[in-house]
Amino acid sequence: MDASELLKRYDAGETDFQGENLCGVNLSGTDLIGADFSGCDLRGANLILTYLNRANFNRANLQGAQLCGANLSQADLLGANLQDADLHGVILYAADLRGANIALANLLDSNLISADLRNVNLSGANLRGACLRGVNMRYEKRVYNGVNLRGADLHNADLRGANLTGADLSRADLTEANLNEASLREVTLTEADLSGASLQSTFLSDLIGIAVVWKQANLRDAKLERADLSDGDFTGCDLSEANLTGANLTKIKAPQAVMRRSRFNRADLSRADLRGVDLTEAVFIEAYLGRADLRNSILKDANFAKAELSSANLQGANMQGAILPDNSTYED
């Protein structure tokens, strides 16, 4: 079917185009709201600036299609193939993309607010400047796998309040992304870059974040219980009032970091580099600080009750009012 025939039928009131071969068709700038393209072959199709609100692309093949600026709000893209598609500036508000393949696609400056991205493959996708507020990427046992965002470019992306539970963000670029109040429980962030990202009040419990770059990130009030943050770079990071209970912080580097009133109960901080860090009123109950470097750190009123501190380097640290492992108070 060519473009002219399809548009003629649509203008006559027909919306059912299921299973049609529309490979390479040019439908740019047209109005196809509510059309049913489920199962269609739309490889390489030109859908630039096309109105496709509430259209049905269930299981459609849109590999390499051009969808720049298209409006796909509330569209059904369940299981669709959008690999290597150009979705620059596309509107996917509240769209259903469950199980879709969007690997290597260009989603620069796209609008994905409230979209359902469960079990989606976004590996290698470009999501720079994309708005993903309120998206659902939640991992559900026996139903949906965590979304695949390995190596994805999410620089400056808006992910406020997004549910990324169980997602794989290994080696993803999340520099300067906004993840405030998002849910990243059980996420894999190994070797990801979150420099300058904002994660205030974000849920990050049980995540795997080995060798992550957190430079200058805002993690105030973040929930990081039982997270594996080993070998991470927290240079200049703000972790004030964060909850790191039971976290693995072995060999982290945190020069110029601020961790005031943070909780490290039962955390492993062995060989952590915390030189000069502000840990005022931080709580380290039953924490392990074997060979930790706390030289010149600020530990005023910190609580080290039952902590293992015997091999830590505390040279030059300010421990005024700190509670020591034996529950005594430090005195100059």
Feature locations, PLM:
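Tandem repeat scaffolds
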Residues: D2-D332
